[in-house]
Amino acid sequence: MWFKNLQIYRFTRPFEQDADALEKLLDGMAFTPCGSQDISKFGWVAPLGRGTQALVHEAAGQLLLCARKEEKMLPSSVVKDMLDEKVEALEAEQGRALKKKEKEALKEEILVTLLPRAFTRHSQTFLWINPADGYVAV
């Protein structure tokens, strides 16, 4: 694991959480994958990979954490094309232009239909905390 765009920050107050206390805090915010109608999800995962359960890795007083974000990729052009097709068909069927609220309802219906089939993209952000010197690297 290498940091790609390393940002280092200094704490303004002493960092007083130990690994166990931090683990308890993060446990309620553990990562869960996107459901069928979720657009994105964020949470904490084990920094050492899938073989471990600990959300905080401690070594020589240093702490390592990993945040994971999952997003569903639904190109707006696909939604727009489907919306245009449905609007065109309904306008031809009803013989009138659809109102803005009707178009928005159609768009929501299309999103509900497409979200379960959308591809997902994952990203991970590692945090290294040096409590003794008061640094956090992201």
Q: Where are these predicted regions, by residue range?
A:
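N-terminal alpha-helical "arm" segments
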Residues: M1-L22
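Short, flexible turn/loop "capping" segments at secondary-structure junctions
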Residues: M1-W2, E58, I129-P131
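Short cationic amphipathic helices and targeting signals
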Residues: Q7-Y9, L64-C66, G134-V138
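Generic structural motif
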Residues: P14-E16, E70-K72, A132
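Surface-exposed, low-hydrophobicity interaction/linker segments
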Residues: D20-G51, A59-F126
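Internal, conserved structured core segments that host functional sites
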Residues: S123-A137
